[in-house]
Amino acid sequence: MRRFSDTAAREGNPPRDPADPNSNDDRPVAALIGIVEWFQPGDEQHVDDVLADLRAWEVTELRTCIARTDYEATGGPEWCDCLMSHLNGQVQVLPVLALGSTTYLGPSNNGMPHGDPGEYVTFVQKVIQRYEGAFDYVELCGGFNGAGGWTCEPEMQAVAIAEMLLQAANAAREHGRRVVLGGVAPQKLDSLRFLARCGVLEAVDVVGIRAFPGLAGSDWPGWRTAIDRIRTVLSEAGSRAGVWITETGYPTAGHSLARQMDAFLAALEAPVDRVYWCTARDSHHAPQLNDAASVDEQDRHFGLKTATGQHKMLSRIWAEHGLEGLYRLQRQSRRLPQPSTRRYTLITGGAGFIGSNLAHRLLSAGRNVMVLDNLSRPGVERNLEWLHAMHTDRLIVELADIRNSAAVHRAVQKAEQIFDFSAQVAVTTSLTDPVQDFEVNARGTLNLLEAIRAAQRPIPLVYTSTNKVYGGLHDVRLRAFGDRYEPVSRCLRLQGIGEQRSLDFHSPYGCSKGTADQYVLDYARTMGLSAVVFRMSCIYGPRQFGTEDQGWVAHFLIRAMQALPITVYGDGRQVRDLLFVEDLLDAFELAQTHMSRISGQAFNIGGGPARTVSLLELLRLIGELTGQLPLTRHEDWRPADQKYYVSNTLKYQRATGWCPRVGVEEGVRRLYEWLSRAHLPVPAARPAECAVRQ
């Protein structure tokens, strides 16, 4: 099992105390972990994608369905052959041999195969013979509850099912396969006792539990109690069958990411030999039930990843840090006891670059802080580790999504002030998934505003918007001046872009952030909320793990330090003003101090005309720091890219007395030193070159 890397030591954080029982990152996980995933006939890409997911999670067990209806359809045997050839040598397969559809049905389904039970035994024999040596176990369709699916009369169903399972189990054993009786519900053990009386358990090697703790209507006693009850039935029947969890999971339809993680870790600690988690990915397909009205929307959202392959929190932390990382994160997530009178500053998106820096400053000043974050951005869990190591007593971590209205309302209840950094921050992501972009940026902000309004007491809010609300600024006449663009207008060159400029939303990202921007201002005007909007330019500094889409200053530095090429979109002369994060924190604190005077207003926040840089100039500065000019490659301009944006910050300076102190060269040097010390080793220098590579 891969161990969680000691990033705390690597980043210069205080070392863990070996005497602290919470310092041990290793948690014993006795169960073998598998994943449940159903594949639609012909969808080879889905198979390949899931195999890649399993490798990332270091999982070698896969439970999947081979259905008679698919197998006997035109091209069915060929598809099953293709599926097994993809899986062979990659994973150990537990095939669920079913008469019905391969569509994963979720907990709404009773687990029963549909069709003629008389055909089932023949089908089991065909599959075992065709794929000789491909698997050691076969799972027979259980889920027996005395109802549904079979063509015989209702009063005959119980006996017919038991006889079918017994014959199929004996046939599988005759071919050298061990038998799993799947779909056993711990809350409905009368059916298991009936199968025992019919002799079915004598032909079964494993009983597979199908349970989804924590879902609505789930009368759940806990894994240990549930498993003990099943083992009692087995003991009474004289059966030596083992017990696995063959189907469990937790959906994220309501963005309950922390609950999915908690349910996953709870299942791993159950006293069984094997656990199969549902599912690798959310469902692309509508569930195929006889009674379509019984389909639950949550059944589509059990995946560790979305249907398009995006990580959810559990998936990403598991892939990057292993199971130990999940246990550590669970320990760091601290919820307030209820009821509680403890007040705190709420920072949504507080595990990110800006949020973690602000949390550190407030905690260092003796304030209580709640960080609410879904950890969707790679690397931010390191910030949580750092905060947890430095400020355990006053830090509250709520692993939640801003789209989860209930979680947001709970977090706001005891807040005395709020800083909102939760956002989908990448223009490129907004172009590929505009619905998610809108849900996070616009709907998420509305959730927060409604929670503040429901509190019926003043909770001052600082909302971080973006300069993208001003659009592409194509009407600003520019000229090339050396390695940068500058406005033809002398006034713009000296002062930058002011708040009086008309809004012009470009790109879905600009639209969603602009929508949220205007909602915050309007709630301040019409609902009486205390709130200000910061339309921010480029922020940089320690604890920034940059990507091409956000945190580009850190991204450039990291790529250069790794001797990797930097992609420059356009000609590299585009100009931005840079604001060091410590100066931004000063602005945040002043906003709360002066909230009564500035509420309902928007302010441009950035380094201003005195702290500007073009991409080409930044590359040269990085070369001076590293001793080698970065490698670059150029791509076409991206949609909605601004060739020039510099904030006019005079309005905010006059309102609060704020003034940035850190210049570009000093700030970039400080970020480089932090990255060198805490994030990356610096490779051996190449000879310095006289120009940026084109």
Residue ranges: model-predicted function:
Residues 358, 364, 400, 558-694:
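C-terminal substrate-binding subdomain of Rossmann-fold SDR/epimerase-dehydratase oxidoreductases
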Residues 20-126, 132, 139, 145:
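N-terminal substrate-binding region of glycoside hydrolase catalytic domains
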Residues 115, 255, 403, 432, ...:
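Residue-level signal for the nucleotide or nucleotide-sugar donor/cofactor binding architecture
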Residues 44-46, 74-78, 105-206, 210-232, ...:
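Active-site cleft segment of glycoside hydrolase catalytic domains centered on the general acid/base Glu
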Residues 31-37, 62-64, 93-97, 138-140, ...:
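Hydrophobic faces of well-ordered beta-strands that scaffold small-molecule active sites
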Residues 473-495, 508, 514, 518-592, ...:
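NAD(P)-dependent short-chain dehydrogenase/reductase
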Residues 333-537:
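N-terminal Rossmann-like NAD(P)+-binding domain of SDR-like oxidoreductases, especially those catalyzing
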Residues 255-259, 276-334:
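Aromatic-rich peripheral "rim/lid" segments of glycoside hydrolase catalytic domains that contact
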